[in-house]
Amino acid sequence: MRTFALTAGLLLVPLLVSAQVDTAVAGARLPQEVAREVAALFNATTTLRATDRTVIPAGRDVPGDVAVLNGPLIIEGHVAGRVLAINADVLLRPGARIDGDLLVVGGEVEGREHATIGGELRIYRPALRHVMEGERMRVSAEEPRAPEDWWRRFERRRRANTNRLEIANAGVYNRVEGLPVRIGPVLYRDQGWGHLRFAANAIVRTGSSFSSSTPDVGHTVGGELRVGRRYGVTLGGRLYDQVEGVETWQLSNAEVGLASFFFSRDYRDYFGRHGGQLFAALRATENADLTVSYADERWRSREARDPPALFNNGRAWRVNPELDAGRFHVANLTVRVDTRNDTFNPWAGWYLLADYERGTGVIDRAGPVSPGVRAVPSGSTRYQRVFLDLRRYNRISPSSALNVRGVLGGWVSGDPLPLERRLSIDGPGTVPGFDFRSAGDNDVGTCASSSAPAGRPAQCERIALAQLEYRSDLRISLSDRRAGARRTRFRVDGAWIFFADAGRGWLVNAPGNPLNIGRHDFPALSTYRTDLGGGLDFGVVGIYAAKALSVSREPLNVFLRVRHRF
């Protein structure tokens, strides 16, 4: 057990670098009163405004207030009034002096120990969302939508302050369902002290609902009661017959759907879930929540269909592996902590997802596995599994960041894990220098020890992954001069990336298998898959190249990611 704990600690050492301690407020959203204060100060006629990199050199005295948007702001001299930095970092050089307050929104402050700040220092890590109307700033009223929102179709909402009605939305395009479309009402009622929500949807699958002799239509019916506004308790339950991905942690829904629709490359495996679930959630702080759930459901395999793809349509889809079929009772305890300054473009803060799962049930039909991975299940099955995803985002200069991530997960005790709960280190979401589901014996990515079943499913009982990423701002602009004035005709903001990854999977309940490691041990670090890579990230999409280091014969891989790698 000591070896297991020691090696786990070594993998997570980079994540435990302490964050800079400051007078700061972290959270997913900027308080509205602060947003209004920022806009008022920026729009004041007496404020000296700038919207790009700004330097106040040594020896210069600025008599009033200063506001900088985007920045960074570098102060070497003296500001007699207040200083406001919006979505910008502030760098204070030795001898810098600010007589008034220093307010930073969506940024960090460096060098304060060498400078003098006469007023109050406040740092709010969430970025300010705003619209510029000429030279005036207006605070945006709506929060940004999640990247999957582009899937929504045929949506109608009644804008009264007590009800909302959604007619339909779509899920993730995949090789098993095609496009799953949820049709039905979602009713929402705001009660002041909280809210009530009820949804009843039929799931129509374009790949199977209209082509099979037996209509393949799923459903989700559920409701929840929330007590509290920003903080509070949520109680709910649902009934469902739906298709679920085996490993949803590696790539986002948007990435999986786009890769499937455009290139007929589906990076997930799927199984059917039919049953019900009860859950309770507690949100006690701005940055953390706790969820407890219990489900009674039946699992079954699903066959891959032949949905259309825009490109490479002549290439056959990868077989969807046959997984374990049976009835299971599954209990989960999930903790989520998120202090990132921004959900979609973070450069400061922590993110933690920790999940403990206990399952009991009977496997009626066992899915095929590689020789020696497990004995054929018989009788009841009981297992315990954990999954930990820990990330740290660090701004190390006004224009660069060093981000690290560690993932540990897998079997804890009991019987061997069902195939639906097994894991892998494979593909562009983990160690992208290696091809997804590539063939080979003693594969530490999927734990196929020799011949693999059709579709090459994930068979690992434990995994470990470490990712390191260096990001630096990149600004590309084309401009010209007319009548003595410089005009920008084209501008793209992004970042260039260097990254390194290391990870592998292994077995713990397969004596005699070359991929089996003791239950209390960790694999030797020399056996891990490793790679190096780089790329350009333009916020919405990034293009990268990665080369495997641990296996030199692997070719260079070029791939796209939607938003950031992690």
Show which residues each predicted segment covers.
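Positively charged n-region of N-terminal signal peptides that target proteins for export
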Residues: 1-4
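Outer-membrane beta-barrel initiation region
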Residues: 21, 25-30, 34-44, 51, ...
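Transmembrane beta-strand segments that form the barrel wall of outer-membrane beta-barrel proteins
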Residues: 163-173, 194-210, 215-223, 237, ...
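Outer-membrane beta-barrel "beta-signal"
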Residues: 333-335, 533-534, 538-540, 554-566
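Solvent-exposed coil/turn segments that connect beta secondary-structure elements
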Residues: 71, 88, 95, 107-108, ...
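C-terminal outer-membrane beta-barrel translocator/porin domains of Gram-negative envelope proteins
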Residues: 231-279, 309-500, 506-508, 558, ...
